[in-house]
Each structure stands twice: as C-alpha cells, then as structure tokens.
Amino acid sequence: STAGKVIKCKAAITWEIKKPFSIEEIEVAPPKAHEVRIKILATGICRSDDHVTAGLLTMPLPMILGHEAAGVVESTGEGVTSLKPGDKVIPLFVPQCGECMPCLKSNGNLCIRNDLGSPSGLMADGTSRFTCKGKDIHHFIGTSTFTEYTVVHETAVARIDAAAPLEKVCLIGCGFSTGYGAAVKDAKVEPGSTCAVFGLGGVGLSTIMGCKAAGASRIIGIDINKDKFAKAKELGATECINPLDCKKPIQEVLSEMTGGGVDYSFEVIGRIDTMTAALACCQDNYGTSVIVGVPPASEKITFNPMMLFTGRTWKGSVFGGWKSKESVPKLVADYMEKKINLDGLITHTLPFDKINEGFELLRTGKSIRSVLTF
C-alpha cells in the first residue's frame, strides 16, 4: 500500500557535529530505478558513526547516520530483479556491482560504487531520498540506517535467510564482518601464530574471534579499559594488557613478551599513534600489521621506513575483505548454524528513541555493541 508513495517516518538526524541526535519526522521518497526501499528493524551503533558526530570524519550535513542494520524490503524501483518486497536484507556500505575492477579481482572488495573516500552523501543520480522540514538530508555511505525507512542501491543490499533474527545478524552489516574478516581473510592468520589486537570494542573482539577461528595459539588484547578484558578472554584472547600499566612503550612490551614481535597485529581503534605501535610490535622480517580502525580524516602518519624495509607488511582492511553481496548471506548462514558468535558482542538492546543513550554507553566504554530496535 505504500509502494510508489512518499513515506513519513521517524529518523535520527545529525544536524551539526558535537550535538545529540535529533529524532524528527522525515519524508522518504520512493526508490528510483535500481533502488530498494527498506524498512529498518534493527541497527547497531558503531564507532564510525560516532567519529562523524565528533567531527573526526568529515561528512556533508545534515545527515542520517547508521550503517550496520537489517530490515525488510518495502518496495523496489524499476529494473530491480534480485529482490522483492518482504525479503529480509542487510544494507551494505561496501556495495558489490560485479562489474568494476575490485569486484572482478578475486582479492578485491572495495567496489567503486562506494561512497567512502570522498563522500557525496547522495544517491547515484546526485539527489537525496530524504527530506525534513523542506530540507534535503544527506545519506551516509550509501546506507543511512538510523531511520525507520531508507533507500539504497540494489548493489548495496544482500538478501538473507528469512529465519534470521535481525536484532542479531545486523552486526554482520559492519562490526562483526569487519573484524572477523580482517583476521581470516585479509591477514590470513596462520595456525599456531601469535596475534595482537589493539582496541577491544565490537570490531576488536570480532578480530579476536577471527584469530581464534584461524588457529592462532596466542592472542593478546590491548586496551586502556580493563573492564573489557573479561569479555575479550571469553571470546578468545589468551591474555590482555593495559598500556597505561606498562613502564615501556607497548610495542617494546609486546616484542619482549613474544621473543621478537608478533606474527600479526591489528589496529582496531583509528588512532595514528596506535597504528605505528601496531606496526612496530610485529616481527621485523615477516610480521603483518593490519589497519582496521577508521583513520582520522585530517591526520598524516610518520614512521621510519626501515620498519618496512626489513620485511614487515602493513596493510588496510575494509569490511574484512569480504565481497559484500555474496559473502553476507553466507556469514548469516554461519550464524544460523552456530559457527560464529554474535550474541556475545551485544551488551545492550534499546528502543530506537534511546539512540543518544546508546551513544553515551559507547563513549563511556560501558557497551560493546548496542542494538537499536524499531
């Protein structure tokens, strides 16, 4: 009954940085050709969303944030053949068009249809599907899930198992897949190896689960919040360190603990100082360090190139290296078969209108993953 019509619904709008989310009534236009309108039923709160509200990631405002979600297709635009109303889906902030070089390359996944590097905050035709009080509202990295309804391109949607619990599998839209894949797919952690994970939030804990699944024998969690250590050990960390308790730089401590450096390190925070520390703590000839945390937009990194000359590998990881549209349904199937643990990451489930409380839990380190339900 709503197909082809403008839908009025609730959304949390970011009007300006360093201000709380404002819940407003918005208008959501019908999907255009090759677009899908989705009724969002659950969305996770991710640190990347908070980076925007804090001003660390520059985005065009006003904007509807949110990118880790699950919902049901409400209607489809002209030419959409792979999805139909009623399908359970996960929106994808890394699309998969299947035609560009990263999509065609077996080791690529950052489809050129993404809106990550130089975000326009608009759909492919250069317009928005959201309005509020007569103003256009920008989209966030092609997803925008802090709203009851959103519109995404069909290349940025994965259909999933109709029996999947959306308030759990929404984490596959970002946090879990990003961390788990960084270990098993991008770093290709080997059995018996030693790993260090900097940052024990939802993505860092997912990285720990990936290291464990890959057969790492020693997994060292690093965080300045000791309250996260018990959960990290529950999910696979063999030991945890608070750098504030160390008399030496953390990279020196890790090098001494491991007899010369770890095999794999993961920076899952998004800070320049921890990125260089994670690189330095790797074994200098064959260690691999992976940047998983979103780096601050305006900062530059300085390091001694000898750290790479000796043989270390330094690489980045976006969405865990997964080809999104084909991999997300498989990860959901793995959850349904109890091969992966999402429940252990979710510490809070809140109604959507408590979004500001959810972000406060994140900022104060009291949550791992909070999920908002509609």
Curated annotation (Swiss-Prot):
InterPro entries recorded: ADH-like_C, ADH-like_N, ADH_Zn_CS, GroES-like_sf, NAD(P)-bd_dom_sf, PKS_ER
Modified residues (N-acetylserine): 1
Protein name: Alcohol dehydrogenase 1
Signal peptide: none
Free-text comment on the cofactor: Binds 2 Zn(2+) ions per subunit.
Keyword Metal-binding included in the entry's annotation: yes
Binding site for Zn(2+) 1: 46, 67, 174
Source organism of this protein record: Alligator mississippiensis
